[in-house]
Structure formats: C-alpha cells, structure tokens
Amino acid sequence: MAQARISAKANEGRFCRSSSMADRSSRLLESLDQLELRVEALREAATAVEQEKEVLLEMIHSIQNSQDMRQISDGEREELNLTANRLMGRTLTVEVSVETIRSPQQQESLKHATRIIDEVVSKFLDDLGNARSHLMSLYSACSSEVPAGPVDQKFQSIVIGCALEDQKKIKRRLETLLRNIENADKAIKLLEHSKGAASKTLQQNAEARFN
C-alpha cells in the first residue's frame, strides 16, 4: 500500500514537471514569435529609411541640374548650390544597411541582373534612345502589371531567381534610371531650344542690319 502511494506521488511529480516544461516552452515560443514581428518591423523601417535617402539624393541632384538653376544669376546659383551640397552631405551621413539573406543561386541571379543593367547604363552616352527602350523592357520584366511595351523574357527569368528584397531593389533602380534619362532628355531639348532661339535672334538682328 505504501509502495503504491510512493509510485503515485512519483508519477504525479513527473506529470507536473512535464506540464511545467510544456508551459515554459509555449511561453518562450510566443515570445520569439513576438520578437520575430519586431525584427521584421525593424527591417521594414530600415528599408524605408534607405529608400528615403535614395529619393532625397535624387531630388537634390535634380534641383542642381534643373533648367531653373541655369536661368538665375551666377551669384544666386552659387548660393543655392552651396545649400544643395550641404544637404547632400548631411544626407550622406545617414548610413543604413539592410543585408539580404540569399542562397548561392539567388546571389548568382543578382550578379547576373546587375551586370545586365550596368551594361545598358554604360551605353547611355552612345545612344540615349536605345538605352531608354532597353531599360523599359527590363522594367516591364519586373512589373506585375500588364506591360505597355515589350518584355525582356530572359531578364524576367533572372529576376525571378533573385531574393524578393533584391527584386524590389532592382525595380527601384530601373525606375530611377528611367527618370534620370527623362530628365536628361528634357535638358537636351531645352538646350537645343535655347540654341535655336538664340540662333534665330542673331539671324533676325543680322537681317535688320542689312535692311
């Protein structure tokens, strides 16, 4: 009888310990789940800061190279450039780095995609129009919407092989490059228009002298 009571108490102790361990494990797992949400929120916030830095630098650069900047006095332009350079310097002091975990295959796909974009960029000065068309086909390959133009199928398959975060970065880079080309094209047209207007004025002045 005494032996039975001892065995019952031993079994009860084992049950209590097992139940207690399960509770601890459950609490620890719940804590880790909550921490995982905070880690993802941290990465998203850091990525947002990284993107905001890129946007700010692009906007400052755009202002410095705008047509309005060319149509003000030298003194005003110098003062505004000093302010723009100061803002750019302060922006560059913000260092944010969000590392992407990649498999060897994803790493290789990213290198391949980056190399293709770099090759197009290197041809900007030779043929701006063709570079724009090529970039548009690359961008269409990254878009989930129905593309308006041709899609580079080979590039699309390469991008699909990249990590999701890298796919987003590739798309953002292409968007930035296309905006830069558009701004450069506008600047060239404005310059040509200014030259044409100046040439026309000179011609009219010359004709007026002869008359």
From Swiss-Prot:
BAG domain location: 109-189
Residues carrying Phosphoserine: 20, 31, 73
One GO-annotated biological process of the protein: protein stabilization
Positions in coiled-coil regions: 20-61
Annotated GO MF terms: adenyl-nucleotide exchange factor activity; protein-folding chaperone binding
Keywords: Acetylation, Chaperone, Coiled coil, Phosphoprotein
Location of N-acetylalanine modifications: 2
InterPro entries: BAG2, BAG_domain
Disulphide connectivity of cysteines: none
Subunit structure: Binds to the ATPase domain of HSP/HSC70 chaperones. May interact with NWD1. Interacts with HSPA1A (via NBD), HSPA1B (via NBD) and HSPA8. May interact with DNJC9; the interaction seems to be histone-dependent.
Role of this protein: Co-chaperone for HSP70 and HSC70 chaperone proteins. Acts as a nucleotide-exchange factor (NEF) promoting the release of ADP from the HSP70 and HSC70 proteins thereby triggering client/substrate protein release.
Protein's UniProt name: BAG family molecular chaperone regulator 2
The species this protein was found in: Bos taurus (Bovine)
Species classification: Eukaryota, Metazoa, Chordata, Craniata, Vertebrata
Gene: BAG2
